[in-house]
Amino acid sequence: MARYTGPKAKLSRREGTDLFLKSARRSLADKCKLDSKPGQHGRTSGARTSDYGNQLREKQKVKRIYGVLERQFRRYFAEADRRKGNTGENLLQLLESRLDNVVYRMGFGSTRAEARQLVSHKAILVNGQALNVPSAQIKSGDVVAIREKSKKQVRIAESLSLAEQTGFPGWVAVDAKKMEGTFKQAPDRGDIAGDINESLIVELYSR
């Protein structure tokens, strides 16, 4: 399955919530009607969505937020289910620990897609070594930094400046001047913002 390359705002409208695909720290709410489905007149049917439909919709939403395709998402769920603890929370922790997401959370990329591009273009170092695998799992204590020759990129500086204004998550420590950060630990469920109901995904895969 190919990765979606169409209008990002349309995906947010389809899910009825801002997926932060277009702009990481600026809401789409003022720019488009998130409660109206894509199309000339939006969805007009008043039919109630089935439980299965809601579960499937939630899975699609989370896949789009993190930019993960179906096969990879299934692997994440299998690993989350294998681990001790709450499966839904484990799933979100695995997704949040992806290198591209950590780069985004540290403010080096204004969106996860931009962060993924930085990783793919070898602009990111992990513990001093170049790593260009967006899905790589980052562990507690890992240091993620911008490669020296990439530090002059205007988009990185602008993204970091905005991230400093809005604040960084408590589970990463960022030195904006050095353009590097430390992944302190995987976030607790309460640390993960966003309109996500992971229990629906667990129910879907438990059918």
From Swiss-Prot:
One of its GO terms (molecular function) is rRNA binding. The keyword Ribonucleoprotein applies. Residues 42-53 have a biased composition (Polar residues). Pfam families: Ribosomal_S4, S4. The keyword Ribonucleoprotein applies. InterPro entries: Ribosomal_uS4 (IPR022801), Ribosomal_uS4_bac-type (IPR005709), Ribosomal_uS4_CS (IPR018079), Ribosomal_uS4_N (IPR001912), S4_RNA-bd (IPR002942), S4_RNA-bd_sf (IPR036986). GO terms for biological process: ribosomal small subunit biogenesis; translation. CDD domains: S4. Residues 97-157 form the S4 RNA-binding domain. Keywords: Ribonucleoprotein, Ribosomal protein, RNA-binding, rRNA-binding. One of its GO terms (cellular component) is small ribosomal subunit. Residues 33-54 are annotated as: Disordered. HAMAP family: Ribosomal_uS4_B. Belongs to the universal ribosomal protein uS4 family. Part of the 30S ribosomal subunit. Contacts protein S5. The interaction surface between S4 and S5 is involved in control of translational fidelity. One of the primary rRNA binding proteins, it binds directly to 16S rRNA where it nucleates assembly of the body of the 30S subunit. This is Small ribosomal subunit protein uS4. It comes from Ralstonia nicotianae (strain ATCC BAA-1114 / GMI1000) (Ralstonia solanacearum).
